[in-house]
């Protein structure tokens, strides 16, 4: 008789992140919305400092969980589902996350926006709501995702939740040159943690842009999708290049040979923003501007 796989547990004996995701997604797959519902496209911004990421988890405060709670109050038994374009990690922010919301009760998009914002905490805001086709899917239809990372060259009293303050002097030109190595289709297994949600560690990076603006270094990474901690580890290794502790040769070695060393260079979540999610025929502005100025 075949034995069921044993669950993974964290060091404190609690269920691991991977098993929490498996349980949650199993529950999602067993509850399919009926055809008798309306679908709405939500444009969401949030300050992720207080949250354990986007995806709803048991016994954890999450962005999706907060919006689902508010939607349940508005639609009661008529609320069906809420799905985001992707998961942001604990502490990561969003300038424009996209989600679709399904409900059997038909309300005007602007009424939904106002009612949700009345119930949501101060650090989550629904910027806009649009009526969408039932065939629209926030995650599956997304063509491109864009992340912005902010590095601060100085200590800041007001912006510490929105930047990574790097005390060392950084060589911007070396960082910018090294960033181009990531463009294209590559195996990013050295730059991510194991994730049960992802079938492959290969990711297409369309572009990486960098810019110095005042006391900030801005890094924009544009790709088809991103795997767990990937963006923060790319930023972290670029900072090591800027410090003079790593080279382009080291990056190529990490990309060609799986290594656990990159994990220790993971940049903090505070400086990371989901900037934009693009769908068919949508284009990203070439302007690279700070999410929060300091």
Residues covered by each model-derived region:
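Structured-RNA-binding interfaces characteristic of tRNA pseudouridine synthases
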Residues: 2-294
């Amino acid at each position: 008789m075949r034995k069921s796989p044993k669950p993974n547990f964290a060091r404190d004996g609690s269920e691991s992140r991977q098993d929490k995701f498996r349980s949650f997604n199993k529950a999602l797959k067993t509850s399919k919305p009926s055809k008798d519902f309306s679908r709405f496209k939500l444009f969401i911004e949030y300050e992720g400092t207080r949250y354990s990421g986007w995806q709803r988890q048991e016994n954890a405060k999450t962005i999706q969980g907060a919006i689902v709670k508010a939607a349940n109050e508005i639609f009661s038994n008529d609320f069906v589902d809420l799905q985001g374009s992707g998961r942001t990690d604990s502490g990561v922010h969003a300038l424009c996350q996209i989600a679709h919301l399904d409900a059997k009760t038909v309300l005007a998009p602007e009424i939904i926006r106002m009612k949700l914002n009345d119930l949501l905490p101060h650090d989550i805001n629904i910027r806009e709501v649009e009526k969408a086709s039932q065939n629209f899917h926030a995650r599956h239809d997304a063509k491109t995702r864009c992340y912005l990372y902010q590095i601060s060259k100085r200590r800041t009293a007001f912006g510490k939740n929105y930047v990574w303050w790097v005390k060392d002097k950084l060589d911007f030109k070396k960082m910018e040159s090294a960033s181009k190595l990531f463009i294209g289709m590559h195996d990013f297994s050295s730059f991510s943690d194991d994730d049960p949600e992802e079938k492959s560690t290969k990711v297409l990076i369309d572009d990486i842009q960098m810019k110095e603006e005042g006391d900030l270094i801005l890094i924009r990474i544009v790709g088809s999708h991103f795997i767990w901690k990937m963006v923060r580890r790319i930023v972290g290794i670029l900072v090591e290049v800027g410090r003079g502790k790593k080279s382009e040769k080291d990056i190529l070695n990490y990309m060609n040979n799986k290594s656990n060393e990159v994990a220790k260079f993971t940049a903090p979540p505070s400086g990371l923003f989901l900037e934009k999610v693009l769908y068919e025929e949508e284009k990203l502005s070439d302007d690279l501007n700070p999410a929060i100025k300091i």
